[in-house]
């Protein structure tokens, strides 16, 4: 099958397996040996399937243009399933009509599948998050005794729930790391015992993550779930919320109901105090990753699932 992805990315062609910025969208393109085109470009060839990731900040896209070059067109969910309802009304209607015109809707999680099937009346398909391991091979065997500290998955805003994650992380009684991201707010650097990682590419991020012993990501905004997935690949237990497939599949013993800070705190304390439970959760995470998210399983699900 000849596949093309259409996104707001300003590049054209294939994605090399050693790309240092191999986030999930690039991993999909790489694994499927697809071509990438900017969403505004006109391809110079025909495709069996075109997958379009409609930009969150520019949803007024017309699928009929892609149907000139692609036998079938699928829309890939971008962001949480409710995001589009913050658009002005005319853009909400435009987005709804766009996904109705698509031949297929691809989504992140089981809950998203139920949402979009109910919204559109069409069958939807989960496109699981993916890691291309070529550039990080060997990191998942990092000895656990060499790991220290807890890392939280996002900054201090409602989108990431960083303050909630920070409070739970304090119960590990160890240094707390946090990535520097686009929603970092003024004053974060003054929080006690909180160390910001510098901005870095994906490969450097996985290397940095591999040095931590625990993860906390109490993010209410459910989408691709890459933080939980990255932790699982490395065998790092990650405390997070239900509703995110990567969290629930790879870290079931560390998953809590939305907003259940009390249970999250208790899990943090148990991971710190109970070595047997910690090792169990490490193994559970890597087993969940290996049984559900490795590249061969992704390919099987995509073409035959």
Model-based region annotation:
Residues 272-305:
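A charged, aromatic-enriched C-terminal amphipathic alpha-helix characteristic of glycosyltransferases
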Residues 210-223, 236:
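Acidic donor-binding loop of glycosyltransferase active sites
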Residues 87-105:
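Membrane-proximal helix-turn-helix segments that form the acceptor-binding/catalytic region
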Residues 103-115, 121-138:
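Donor nucleotide-sugar binding/catalytic pocket of nucleotide-sugar-dependent glycosyltransferases
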């Amino acid at each position: 099958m000849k596949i093309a992805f259409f996104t707001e990315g300003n590049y054209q062609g294939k994605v090399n397996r050693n790309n240092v910025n191999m986030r999930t969208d690039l991993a999909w393109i790489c694994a499927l040996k697809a071509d990438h085109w900017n969403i505004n470009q006109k391809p110079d060839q025909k495709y069996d399937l075109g997958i379009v990731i409609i930009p969150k900040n520019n949803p007024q896209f017309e699928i009929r243009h892609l149907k000139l070059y692609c036998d079938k067109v699928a829309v890939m969910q971008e962001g949480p399933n409710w995001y589009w309802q913050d658009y002005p009304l005319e853009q909400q209607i435009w987005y709804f009509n766009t996904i109705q015109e698509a031949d297929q809707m691809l989504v992140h999680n089981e809950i998203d599948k139920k949402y979009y099937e109910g919204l559109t009346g069409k069958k939807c398909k989960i496109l699981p998050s993916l890691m291309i391991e070529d550039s990080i091979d060997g990191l998942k065997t990092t000895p656990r005794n060499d790991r220290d500290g807890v890392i939280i998955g996002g900054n201090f805003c409602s989108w990431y729930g960083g303050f909630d994650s920070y409070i739970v992380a304090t119960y590990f009684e160890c240094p707390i790391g946090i990535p520097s991201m686009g929603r970092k707010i003024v004053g974060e650097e003054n929080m006690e015992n909180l160390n910001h990682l510098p901005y870095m590419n994906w490969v450097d991020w996985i290397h940095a993550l591999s040095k931590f012993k625990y993860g906390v990501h109490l993010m209410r905004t459910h989408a691709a779930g890459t933080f939980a997935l990255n932790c699982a690949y490395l065998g790092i237990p990650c405390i997070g919320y239900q509703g995110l497939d990567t969290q629930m599949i790879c870290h079931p013993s560390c998953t809590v109901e939305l907003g259940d800070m009390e249970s999250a705190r208790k899990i943090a304390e148990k991971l710190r105090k109970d070595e047997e439970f910690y090792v169990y959760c490490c193994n559970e995470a890597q087993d969940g990753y290996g049984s559900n998210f490795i590249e061969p399983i992704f390919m099987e699900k995509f073409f035959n699932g």
